[in-house]
Curated annotation (Swiss-Prot):
Chain residues that bind S-adenosyl-L-methionine: 74, 106, 125-130
PANTHER family: METHYLTRANSFERASE (PTHR33603), RIBOSOMAL RNA LARGE SUBUNIT METHYLTRANSFERASE H (PTHR33603:SF1)
Domain of life: Bacteria
Name the record gives this protein: Ribosomal RNA large subunit methyltransferase H
UniProt catalytic activity: pseudouridine(1915) in 23S rRNA + S-adenosyl-L-methionine = N(3)-methylpseudouridine(1915) in 23S rRNA + S-adenosyl-L-homocysteine + H(+)
Lineage of producing organism: Bacteria, Pseudomonadati, Thermodesulfobacteriota, Desulfovibrionia, Desulfovibrionales
Organism of derivation: Desulfovibrio desulfuricans (strain ATCC 27774 / DSM 6949 / MB)
Signal peptide: none
Gene field: rlmH
Length: 157
């Protein structure tokens, strides 16, 4: 059973080798079952104040979203889901949504409100603030875990 294609949009490129390796590891595992398109939008100029940088990055994210994308935006103040709940959400979107699920990870300074307003759901990975590079890897691991749950593959305990 292949689910609908997924998409992830994030700000900036992974620069640190171990984050790149970890992301590639989970992308390879996910792609056994489901196509996942990963889009990196250019981050804002570091010389800009954080609010202006967020606004610029927010515009780039919103422009990168296709009209039919079902945006699942990651934000520290979002709804927390267990891994089985994320799997159930992906199953529901596979069955009911017209577009593909598109996870959105902001940059080092978070997200502009315009991105949250475009969201179908705003989700949180943790009560703790995570570096955006780590958040990307955690998200990919959770997508892989959700796929294992949906397929009853022994990975989630």
């Amino acid at each position: 059973m292949a689910g609908k294609p997924l998409r992830c949009i994030s700000v900036g490129k992974l620069k640190t080798p171990f984050w790149k390796d970890a992301a590639a590891h989970y992308l390879t595992r996910i792609k056994r079952w489901r196509h996942l398109e990963y889009t990196e939008v250019r981050d804002g100029d570091a010389a800009l104040p954080p609010d202006q940088r967020n606004a610029l990055e927010g515009r780039r994210i919103v422009e990168a979203l296709a009209p039919q994308d079902v945006a699942l935006v990651l934000d520290e103040h979002g709804q927390k889901l267990s891994s089985p709940q994320l799997a159930a959400l992906l199953r529901r979107l596979d069955q009911e949504a017209r577009g593909r699920a598109c996870f959105v990870v902001g940059g080092a300074w978070g997200l502009d409100d315009s991105v949250r307003q475009r969201a179908f759901k705003v989700l949180s990975l943790s009560d703790m603030t995570l570096p955006h590079e780590l958040a990307r890897v955690v998200l990919l691991e959770q997508i892989y875990r959700a796929e294992c749950i949906l397929r009853k593959v022994p990975y989630h305990h």
